[in-house]
């Protein structure tokens, strides 16, 4: 009897072990933490990625970055300014209630109250109107050639949940407001938020009722997702190498070469849709945090051009970025994706001599001092970039104090227009130029444009051109407008483009995933093998 029971017992043990192995825990890290669980209050890629585990868009991007149906199943564009979306039936919120058109209309109206660029996106999407429980009509002010891209920016929230918890308006992250939605979330997405201990961990668990499982969208095997913010790069990488975590979103660039030779690890890398750039306060009559009194040097194009021409981007690529950057003269996250010809990718030439001459002509022969505000946990080597640039500016007499801070403090500062000069980045899923030109280059207006134009630069001709571009449906005319805008930004030195990032990810060698140029980790495709 014992001999017969033994094989049965072994089989049972194998089955138990197999079942346990299927319930995978995925542990990952990066240098920063989430900003808020309110999905309409802070438009920052990492924060959107965390919120995207819980909340969903009407349309979203697939593995190849193509737009695909999500909460909207299909759509038509019967008139130039009308779009009709058929919503997916059978979708349930995490509390078991049914997703309907009321939630969509509510969410787009709510986003219009946002203090950041979600206001712009909801305005571009037009007015949402419920036709029936599973049909929504959007009416826009003008034709929108990138309507679907626009919708892939607004997460849909549960109307009843927001009303019950008194969060019918997005919190103002810039003012550091706290509401129930700051630390709580309830969506339709593939994961449920279990807990967020700020600065310690974010824990999610798989939503077994997610509609995407039956639809075949869930290809991973993760039951729980355990995120741990680790600001120190060496500590982060030590945790990965020792197996304490499975994945690092932002390995230190200086470690990438050695990691490529480590057989216990995998390196995933490719170009990111993101521009790293410098901006200046061009609005105030007297510059903040500067030894110049009674005027603002950065209102003078010659000063901005001097700052531009004093920067050696090739040196930054070699010494700071270790090759993980692509210097550019085009102020767009993806020039090729926006259709801008390569012939336009020309920088104002690096020349310390010319930069000094420009400062002298502008009335600053001895230069001047000011503060450069930088994040130290947001972009690849962001703090080191600022320190290196400050050193380059010192050669022409610009005396720079580098003000370093976490992104939790950086974004409220710059969004509140409390910076003299700053280093920032902009990117995302869409490569269309309007998604950079409208929030970053256009001046601020009541419809949400210019919300991320942190220096409040204003050039009337650029504003007019961008406004026309926004509704232009003729591809050839639209491309000409994009090219013209790029040239005007370059000529006026609206901002100083530095480079687009090449993003490395690092994982244990038993992890499979999809590396995408929006720098968003799709957890539904991650497998722990």
Question: What are these model-derived regions, one by one?
Answer:
Residues 179, 209-258, 301, 391, ...:
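Ligand-site clamp/hinge motif
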Residues 29-79, 109, 186-190:
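N-terminal lobe/hinge region of extracytoplasmic solute-binding protein
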């Amino acid at each position: 009897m014992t001999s017969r029971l033994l094989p049965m017992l072994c089989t049972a043990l194998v089955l138990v072990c197999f079942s346990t192995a299927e319930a995978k825990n995925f542990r990952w890290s990066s240098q920063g933490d989430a900003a808020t669980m309110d999905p309409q209050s802070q438009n920052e890629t990492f924060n959107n990625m965390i919120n995207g585990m819980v909340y969903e868009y009407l349309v979203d991007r697939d593995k190849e970055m193509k737009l695909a149906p999500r909460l909207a199943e299909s759509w038509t564009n019967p008139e130039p300014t009308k779009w009709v979306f058929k919503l997916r039936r059978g979708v349930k919120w995490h509390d078991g209630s049914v997703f309907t058109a009321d939630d969509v209309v509510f969410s787009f109206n709510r986003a219009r109250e946002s203090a950041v660029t979600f206001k712009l996106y909801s305005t571009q999407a037009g007015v949402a109107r419920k036709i029936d429980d599973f049909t929504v009509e959007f009416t826009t002010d003008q034709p929108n050639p990138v309507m679907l891209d626009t919708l892939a920016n607004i997460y849909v929230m549960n109307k009843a949940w927001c009303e019950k918890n008194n969060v019918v308006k997005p919190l103002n992250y810039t003012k550091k407001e706290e509401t129930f939605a700051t630390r709580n979330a309830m969506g339709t997405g593939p994961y449920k938020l279990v807990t967020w201990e700020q600065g310690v961990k974010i824990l999610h668990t798989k939503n077994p009722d997610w509609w995407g499982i039956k639809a075949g969208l869930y290809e991973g095997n993760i039951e729980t997702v355990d995120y741990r913010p680790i600001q120190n790069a060496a500590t982060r990488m030590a945790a990965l190498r020792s197996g304490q975590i499975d994945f690092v979103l932002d390995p230190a660039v200086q470690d990438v070469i050695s990691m490529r030779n480590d057989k216990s690890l995998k390196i995933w890398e490719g170009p990111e849709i993101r521009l790293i750039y410098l901006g200046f306060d061009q609005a105030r009559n007297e510059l903040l945090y500067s030894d110049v009194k009674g005027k603002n040097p950065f209102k003078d194009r010659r000063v901005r051009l001097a700052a531009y021409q004093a920067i050696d981007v090739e040196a930054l690529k070699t010494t700071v970025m270790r090759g993980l950057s692509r210097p550019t003269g085009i102020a767009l996250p993806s020039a090729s994706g926006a259709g801008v010809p390569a012939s336009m990718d020309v920088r104002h030439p690096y020349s310390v001599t010319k930069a000094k001459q420009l400062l002298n002509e502008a009335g600053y022969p001895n230069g001047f001092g000011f503060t450069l505000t930088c994040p130290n946990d947001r972009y690849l080597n962001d703090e080191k970039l600022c320190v290196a640039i400050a050193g380059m500016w010192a050669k022409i007499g610009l005396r720079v104090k580098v003000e370093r801070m976490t992104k939790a403090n950086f974004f409220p500062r710059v969004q509140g227009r409390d910076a003299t000069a700053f280093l920032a980045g902009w990117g995302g899923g869409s490569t269309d130029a309007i998604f950079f030109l409208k929030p970053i280059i256009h001046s601020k207006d009541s419809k949400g444009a210019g919300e991320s134009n942190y220096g409040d630069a204003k050039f009337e001709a650029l504003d007019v051109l961008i406004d026309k571009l926004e509704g232009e449906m003729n591809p050839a005319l639209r491309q000409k407008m994009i090219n013209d805008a790029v040239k005007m930004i370059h000529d006026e030195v609206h901002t100083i483009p530095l480079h687009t990032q090449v993003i490395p990810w690092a994982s244990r060698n038993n992890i499979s995933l999809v590396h995408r140029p929006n720098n968003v980790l799709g957890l539904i495709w991650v497998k722990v093998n």
